[in-house]
Each structure stands twice: as structure tokens, then as C-alpha cells.
């Protein structure tokens, strides 16, 4: 059985079966137990070697044994090699090695579960990887991701006739799919700490501390070890808290009606299984749906905020009226019938044709997926199992460390060569060599990088931007292409109705009011929608649905009523009649149209069946009985002005069709032979920050493009408004309908140029014009080179389908460009997931977010206050006073003195405002702001007043969208610049850390080798003080905030390049020269030691003093010169913590040289220096700093790669 074919899943690249061996037979147990340790014992008892050799042998063997065990913890393949043996037979295997296909995810060894199935007594083999279950399929000889009944092709008719599960089926399904729950185990603190404690860098850091302890640096080593362990404990605690919060994301089980064995009865939602038929109902607890469901009958209004983050209610229609012979398509055609797990049901409407009556007046639905296989489960898995430790380019970092290792090996070789000629202890010599080699591995790098990314996450959350995959933040720092959807992204979500065109026979170009259209056109407008009336207990009924449709019906003056009735305003011919929508086909981005069937009765007349269709003009044109003369010119003319144009068609059926027969109508028969009713003209204003954001991205070396499903003329107009296109624009489209000939057209139709789909674009075309491509034209081009030529030079893509958006992003990715996609998280899911940086914009307001934050803050306060009350009761103390923020949550009284004061203050503000309004005095902006704050305070008053009656809220899904790794709760385009800003900041910090750590490591290696052999040592106090000051700088190095304006200059993306390596080596060379120079100067003032005793304890000397103070300045220059501030983030002087930390170190160094404070010098164990020597040492410090600065500036000027790629440039 080949390892590659063992698991068939796009998420897993390979797998291998293993048999776990008993503990004694593990490779890190039996060789040591049977041979190594008995031999060591024999040597020890017989004293065959010197004590020094035996001592070194014990340390070496202990280290090797530990490394044997740790190697298995670090690498799963090594673990399998040491603890298991391979097998090709699944019947024998106990474990399986799983290698994921995603870059950055680690391999995992998972146990294989064996279950005896009750129906056939066969054994089912399965394993779980990242909470995803894989089952062995004997006929295929491989493991496959668990499949659900709905994954197999099923007809609509089959699902409609579904009678639920039988007892035997439910028992089999329970074995196969398990319970419907999110089982996220929370490890204990000890378990998590053990996982962190065996991490390579942590082990390495502790190992280094132990080495320093062996070399008599106790204070410094113990202080470092304490800091490392404390930091790791804080990380473990944070991780444990995060896992606890993730666990609260699962929906609390509740009872639901299920149809099994042809009977309805209640069961817990945890016991639901695929193919169960359930009754969907709005429950009082407001719990989310327990799993993914397919609506069989009726309709629902749902809120998918927990899943997508979008709070706008959506209308879901069942598959009831779909043709029975049609095959179910939950990803496209039937997507609107899917109820996703975690979404809240706001309202259900039963169908009069439903044969399966529910006992609780709910609507029937069939279970599609359960547990972690649901859409909500997928999002939870992404959040739980996304890379927890953020790393840089691992390959580059490895090369960088290997490069530094060359210098360390040379230094340790020098120490061994010189030391072996003396009588020095081989133990100490080997210890020195190991310490030198370990000194070049920057053990602080993971911690520093993690701090930089966490700082960015925190900064983004202040803008209500949330990220589920933090490793993508550095990617946003070197973006090449930024793609934007139009509607709801660059333009506002709400549409303004301008009127209707094409209805005035004398002047078809004129724009008329909707109410001035013909009666048939008015009826078409009033019924061509999917709006419903949402009625919730205790709330005013409200209309929910597409914002554009709401705006249209409101403009017309009609109203939406219960049971899909629409009522006309007084004065209309339909005022006292009846209009009921009996069938809806929701708008589909693939089909580009929406249609409705209604039964209409004008007052006193008979019923008629009426069809209304609206959609893209070019689509509706194919359905019209007769296309008007200027049809194309009219809609293109309005499109050029930036309006959104929808064509409207209608027809009456010859015979009245009752509601119970409407399901017999096919969509094709409905959407044909239509009468043209006009063009609905909408305008969607640009978002306030759209133009400014696009301009900032253009000016900061990014290529901005628009990818939209709207028509090309409107898209080009909006692109011109925001600055995506600057030159005259040509649109590539098919020449005539139903033809494959492509043609370039100007937006005013004055230019027509042929296009060869087999030939790349000519330079003369894109140098003179900006280009727009339609989805129809793109589908005609097959040649990959031509496609890439278009993607390189086009700026606007219009009338593209969701799948085409995804194809475009993936093509750009595969050609080496770093991409960003910004969309609404609904139609753009595929493209958002494909992009390196996908950003879903949601529609919450800042006031909503502030109110939510205030509510959360007060709930935390409530928890703290309740604990205070419990403690007071336990110790018989008086009840503590209510905090001011919670005063409205408790009744007034002596224990709540703040409530009356707060109420009095609010009443006074409101009285003053009312007085001003009554006297018709114009309110100032400040007073308007005060009024808004007072209204918000009133809302908070009501919220807090009811807070004591509610349970403490738990963290739920809603911050993150299932569609994208980045989610902006606010629908502002400036979220993109905020993400780019933080990405650049993190990327700059990454490069900076590599440089600083590399220089520190090289200087340390030199100090431990050449300087150490010259008898130069540092005292414990010197190490501790400089180490503490360096810790402050390391902490602050990644805390610099980004600048508001994005610079045209791009940050250096890589690590292993001429600029970084050249700068590090150049600065290192300067430091070495100054160290050698000052050593020789010292020998002019004191004689060098004839014989250096390396084992001698530290004694202050002029050489030690000079080297220590010079190295302090070298550390200052390393941080200050390699610090990258403007134009990406605040300058060194603005990063106060680091600035003052470096000033502190410089002060210590200069004060030590000038002997400014004898007490400080005594504390630092420095000796007195001659005046001339002080001058020379100060001059050397200045030369060292200045020379390093010059090296850095020269390398930066001539070798830094900060030029944008060609695709970013307009020509």
C-alpha cells in the first residue's frame, strides 16, 4: 500500500501506518538500559579512566539520551522510527502518521480506532486529525474524509419523501458520525507546559542557562532561567484561557423535535445524526441551529452573524417548489435552502403544501452535516488549529543560522586549538566550545516574532479587525496586488433609487418616478423581490431582505405584509385588491436574475397570475418577447454614469394558477416571453474613505484592481471615481450575443478594436488605455500566457462569477504575486480564501461595537462584583458598594449611591436638550454630539437594567467570518490600510530582529573565544545589569507603532540577501576592529599577563573594564542603527521604552568611562582609568558607532530590495 494513496484528502499530503511498540522496546529505552548504563556503571566501579573523563562521559551520555527522547518530541517521523514499526496492513496498525498539505502545519501521529459495526459485524477503522474524521474504505484500500449522505447525488423528489431514520439506521450512523458536538478538550496546565517545555528553542534556552551556571555565572543564569520559565508559563496560561474560550463556542444542547420511525418525538441536539428530519423553530433561548440543515418546506428568516459575522437577517427558501427530478446542489442552486449550524432562526413560515406536519408548528428540515463537519465546526477548527506559533520564512532563517554557524565553528576551533596546547581542563575547554557554538543560535527569535505579531493583533482589534490566521499578518506587509469588490466594499451597501427609465415613449432616456410608471410596471416592481415581514415577540415588525429591494418597495410606497402579501398605497388601482407572491426564485450571482410568481386581484375583479423578473439587462434581453429599439443604448448610458441598472420584465399567464399548482411551473416557462417594463436605475454612493484608501494604496506601491459582478460601464465609472483607473478605458467583451468573437470597446462606443484570444496584449494598447475585462470575454480565452497578459495589464473585471474571481486570485498567486482580496464574505468566499490576505467587510457601525464592548466590560465587572459579595458573606463583612458602571443594574439604596446621581445627570442633559429644541434654537455640532451620547447612554441604561436578569454571556462566534482569515466588523475600506500598515510593521520588526540577534550572537562568539583566551571576563553583576537593560530593549523593539501614512517605499521582504548579510558582516567587522584596537591600547597602560589563568575567578582589570564598556556601546549601536523606524513605523525617539532604555545603557557606558559616579563604577566592578585612556576609549566608542552607521546606510542605499514588481507599475 503506497503511503501517498493511503489517505485521500486535499488537506493531507500523505500517511503511513505504524504498530506502536511496548515502552521497553523504544529506541531511547532498551539500548541505554541494556548496554550504555551498565557499561557506565562498570567504568565507574572499576575507575578505568580519570575522574574528569568519567565526568564528561556522564554528561555526554545523559545529554545524548535526553536528545534521543527529545528528537521524538520534535519530529513525528523520528518518533515513529523510535517507538513504532511500519506496516502495510490496516488490521495490524495501531497508529497512523499524518502529513498535512498546508505549509506551516505539523505532522501528527494519531491512534487508529477500531469499532465493530452492529449491522454487519465488520470492523470499522478510523482516525481523527484536527477533529476531522477519516474512515477506512476496504474497497478503495485507503482512508477518506467521512462522507455524508448528502455528498452523494440525490434528487429533490427523494429528499421531499424522506421519512427520517429508522432505529437500525440511527445506530449505524451513530457509530459512523458520532455525537453532534464540538468536543474541544482543555489540557491541564501541566500537560500544556510539558508540550512547551520540550519545544526545541525552550530546551536550547535552558541548556544555555545550565552551561552558564557550569561556568560560574550563577546570578545571570538563574535570572535568565527564571525569566524564560515565567514567560513560557504566561504563554501556557494564555493558551489555556484561549482554549477555554473556544470551548464556549459550542452551542449548548437543547431539545428539538425529530422524525424517526415515522413518529415525532423530542431528543437532545447532541443526538442528531445526518439524514434526521427535524422541526426548525425559533426557540425562546435564542440558541443557534445545532448543525447544517436543508430546508424541505416553508421558509425561514435567519441571522448568520455567528458564522459570517454579518448581522443582516437573511431569507431562506426551501426546496419544496424545485422540480422533483432535479439533482440537489447545496453549493450553488440550492445554497439558499441551507441553514448553517450556529445561525439563529428569527422566524419560520409554514407551507400550506407540506405533507409532513410538525408537532410544534416548525418547518421540516433534513440534517446535512454534524459536529466539526458543519460550516461552524470548520470555522472553529480553523481558529483552534491555525498555526499558534508564528514563524518567519523557515528556510531563510535556517540558512541565516547556518551562515552564522560557520563563524561559531571557526571561533570554537580557535579556542580548542589554543586551549589544547595548555594544561587547561578538557572539561572546561569543551564547555567553552559548546557555549560558543550555541551562542549563534538566536534563541529569542521565536519569542520576539511572537511578540511582534501579537502586538499587531492587538492593534488591529482596536479597529474591530479580527484575524483567525496570524501567520498571514507579515504577508500583508509586502503585498503586490489589492483586489476589491464594488458593491458593499467600495460603494455603500444601501442603494438609492433614482427612478425608472425606458418607459416614456417620447423620451425613453428620461428618468421617471417609479409611481409614474404603468400599472403593470408598478406591479412588477412591487412583486419582483424576496422581502418578508419579520415579527418577533416584543419588537416592532420589520421588513428583512436585500437592501436594494427594500429601497425599491419603499420608494414605490408599497408595504410588505404577512404570508407574502404586498399592499399598495391609497390611490393605487391595486389599493383594495390582493397581491400575494406565491413563488420566488431568489437572485443568483451565477444566473444574474430574480423572478417571482404572484396572484393578483384588482378590486372587484378576478384573480390573475402574474410573473415579474428583474436582472442584468443583457440577461433579461434574451427573455423578452420584443427588445425595444434603444434598449442597449439606454442601459449603457446610465451605466457610464455609475448607476446600477436592472432590467424589468413581466407577463400574465393566460389561465389563473392556484397556489397549490405553482410547483408544477418550471423556471424556464416562467422566465420567457416577457414584456419589457423598464430599467430600474439605482445609485450607490461611494464610501467616505474609499477614494482616500485606494489613493494611499496606489501611492504605496500596490496595484489596486476591481473585481465585480456588476456591469462593466458602472464598474469603470466607480473605478474612475476611486482612482483605480486614470486613462480612457477599453472594455473587452464578446462582439455579439451567442458569438465567441472578442472586441475592445471604449465606454462611449466610439472605439472598436478586434482582439485575438491567442495572442498576448500589445504594449501600444495598455500604454494608451486602462483595460476592463468581462467574465464572458475571460471565459473565451484559454491560452495561459494570454490570460496572464490580461491579468498583468487589466485594472477592472466586470460581470465575473464567484468561480472566476477565485480563478483570478489563484492564477496571480501561482505566478508569484502576493494578493489581497476584499469583499463582502458572501459571493466572494472562494476568492477570499484563495488570497494570501482575504478581508471580509461586515456592516456593523462603530456605535454598535462600542455598545457591545461596553456591555462586555460591564459583564466582566458584574462577575468581579459578585465574587466580592460572596467573599464578604463568607467572612461576615458588609456588602461592598455597587461600582458606578453597574449602578443601573441594581435597585437604588444606601449600597448603590451612584444610581440617583447618574440619573439626575442624564435627566439634566436631556432636559437642556429638549428646552433648546422647543425654542427652535439651532443645535451646535458639540450639542448634537452630546445628544447622541445621551441617547447612547439611555440605550446603555436599558441594557444594563436588564443585565442582572440574563446569564453571563459566553464568547460566541461572530467576530470572525468563515469566509476569510481577516474580518472587519466595520464596513470601512480603511480596514485594508490598517492591515497593510500592521503587516509592514511586523515585517520590518522581523528583519530588524534577525539583524540585531545575529550581531549580538557574533559578538558573543568572539567574546567567548578570542577575548576569553586573552583573560577577559565579565563579572556576574556586569552580566546581570547589561542583561536587564537589554531585556527592556528587546521587549520594546517590536512595540513600535506604525505610521498613519503608507510610504511608497516597500519594506525589505527577505532575510538571506546581500543587504542583510553585508550589513551584519560589515558592522561585525567594525566591532572586531575596535575591540582589537582598544585591547592594544590597554596594553600601553598595563602589561599583558604572561600566563592567562582561565580558571581564575573574575577580578576587575583595565582590560576587562575597557572591553565591557565598549561592548555596551556596541550593543547600543546594534539596536539603534539597525532599528527600522520611518517611513514604516515610529522613529526610535518616538518608541519611548526603547529610546530611554538605550539612553540608559549609553549613560552607564559613558558614566563608566568618565567616572561620573564612583559608586556606579564600584557597583559595576570597574577599575580607575587614566585621563588619556578615557579620551581614547570615548573616541573609539564614537568611531565604532559612526562607522557602523555608515556601513548600514551604504548597504541600505545600494543593496536593499525595496522596488515594487512590474505589475504594480501603471505602464
Swiss-Prot record:
Region annotated A-domain, chain positions: 155-185, 250-388
Region feature Arm-like, mapped onto this chain: 846-955
Binding site for Mg(2+): 485, 487, 824
Chain intervals for the UniProt region annotation (P-domain): 464-493, 688-845, 956-971
Keywords: ATP-binding, Cell cycle, Cell division, Endoplasmic reticulum, Magnesium, Membrane, Metal-binding, Nucleotide-binding, Protein transport, Sporulation, Translocase, Transmembrane, Transmembrane helix, Transport
Cofactor(s) it depends on: Mg(2+)
Top-level taxon in the UniProt lineage: Eukaryota
Positions of ATP binding: 485-487, 587, 644, 710, 824-828
Compartmental location: Endoplasmic reticulum membrane
A GO cellular-component term linked to this record: endoplasmic reticulum membrane
Any single Pfam family the record assigns to this protein: E1-E2_ATPase
GO biological process: cell division; extraction of mislocalized protein from ER membrane; intracellular calcium ion homeostasis; protein transport; sporulation resulting in formation of a cellular spore; transmembrane transport
Any one GO molecular-function label of the UniProt entry: ATPase-coupled monoatomic cation transmembrane transporter activity
Main localization category: endoplasmic reticulum
Membrane topology summary: Multi-pass membrane protein
Record topological domains on the Cytoplasmic side: 1-23, 76-191, 238-397, 1079-1100, 1158-1174
Renumbered residue ranges of the record's region N-domain: 495-685
Function description: Endoplasmic reticulum translocase required to remove mitochondrial transmembrane proteins mistargeted to the endoplasmic reticulum. Acts as a dislocase that mediates the ATP-dependent extraction of mislocalized mitochondrial transmembrane proteins from the endoplasmic reticulum membrane. Specifically binds mitochondrial tail-anchored transmembrane proteins: has an atypically large substrate-binding pocket that recognizes and binds moderately hydrophobic transmembranes with short hydrophilic lumenal domains. Involved in controlling nuclear calcium ion levels.
Free-text note regarding domains: Contains a large substrate-binding pocket that recognizes alpha-helical transmembranes, which alternately faces the endoplasmic reticulum lumen and cytosol, while remaining accessible to the lipid bilayer through a lateral opening. The translocase alternates between two conformations: inward-open (E1) and outward-open (E2) states. Undergoes a series of conformational changes with ATP-binding, phosphorylation of the Asp active site and subsequent dephosphorylation in a Post-Albers cycle (i.e., E1 -> E1-ATP -> E1P-ADP -> E1P -> E2P -> E2-Pi -> E1).
Protein name stated in the entry: Endoplasmic reticulum transmembrane helix translocase
Top-level taxonomy: Eukaryota, Fungi, Dikarya, Ascomycota, Taphrinomycotina
